Amino acid sequence: MAIQEELEATKQQFCAELSQVNSSKDLFDLKVRYLGKKGLFRCFADKLRECPADQKALMGASINDCKTYIENLIRDKNHAILLAEEAAEFLREKIDITLPGEPHCPGGKHIVKKVLDDVVDIFVHLGFCVREAPNIESEENNFSLLNFEEDHPARQMHDTFYLDPKTVLRTHTSNVQVRELRKGQPPIKVVAPGLCFRNEDISARSHVIFHQVEAFYLDRYVTLSDLTAMLTEFYHTFFEREIELRLRHSYFPFVEPGIEVDVSCECRQAGCSLCKHTGWLEVAGAGMIHPQVLRNSGFDPEIYTGYAVGMGIERLAMLQHGISDIRLFCENDLRFLQQFS
């Protein structure tokens, strides 16, 4: 059979097979079978080499014309297949507008985040600047510079998460105090919100992770009266009612004197379940910055004095909203969270 006849037969065979192709994969396989390196057109190249010299130009042109014809058919078929596949995809993804809609509840702030923001805003209005520090802290900043003795129980692994012998997950936001005192100049008035971590048993009253806000003020002539006045204003604003403040002597390594801060309960001393029938709510630990902490930060305690107060945000949220179990804040139960959104 002459090459011209073979080319014509190849065209007809290709068109017949092309009419049966309905997918991109089948079209690719057909293209490889005809135009690939080992395809049918390879035999025409071999025959062209054996063709007499005076016929090679004509035969070569005929082979190229046939190849171009097939390539054009493949291109057109590919375009048609793509359009069909897109149309099918559109049908699969088509939205049935007759179906009932699914309600989407709007998000809201977590109750802990809301209380944290409220607390920080109050301190900012009282003239404090917001500062933060890493959750991963050196043992020196978390303990030593805050006047914790080497044998203090808080340094033990059963109370603190150690990442290595000299690095811990901070147990309080007082590490901000150390960092700010060492790099700032009085007056220094800072509020420091953040996460804290303690190796404790999880119960209704305690958790291994919690939020704390520390506020401290350093300058000349800062006194315990300044601390009391600030706390009274803060809790009056936070609880949105008139409150009485009660200070009880306590011990914290980084303050002297150290105090526990109580505010009067809404029951007005009548006694209720919230205050455990005492008439008072324990809300914070505070005191005057310890002279050794000031020395560790490069300040002369004979010249400068300051106060510091630390409060747990979950504790405040529990008191503000009558929540009895701290674990509820971490359980992501929408029935609980939606009450505050």
Curated annotation (Swiss-Prot):
Keywords: Aminoacyl-tRNA synthetase, ATP-binding, Cytoplasm, Ligase, Magnesium, Metal-binding, Nucleotide-binding, Protein biosynthesis
Cofactor descriptive note: Binds 2 magnesium ions per tetramer.
One Pfam family here: Phe_tRNA-synt_N
Origin superkingdom: Bacteria
Root EC class: ligase
Molecular function GO labels: ATP binding; magnesium ion binding; phenylalanine-tRNA ligase activity; tRNA binding
Subcellular location: Cytoplasm
One GO location term (cellular component): cytoplasm
Reactions listed under catalytic activity: tRNA(Phe) + L-phenylalanine + ATP = L-phenylalanyl-tRNA(Phe) + AMP + diphosphate + H(+)
NCBIfam families for the chain: pheS
Name under which the protein is recorded: Phenylalanine--tRNA ligase alpha subunit
Native organism: Chlamydia abortus (strain DSM 27085 / S26/3) (Chlamydophila abortus)
Record gene name: pheS
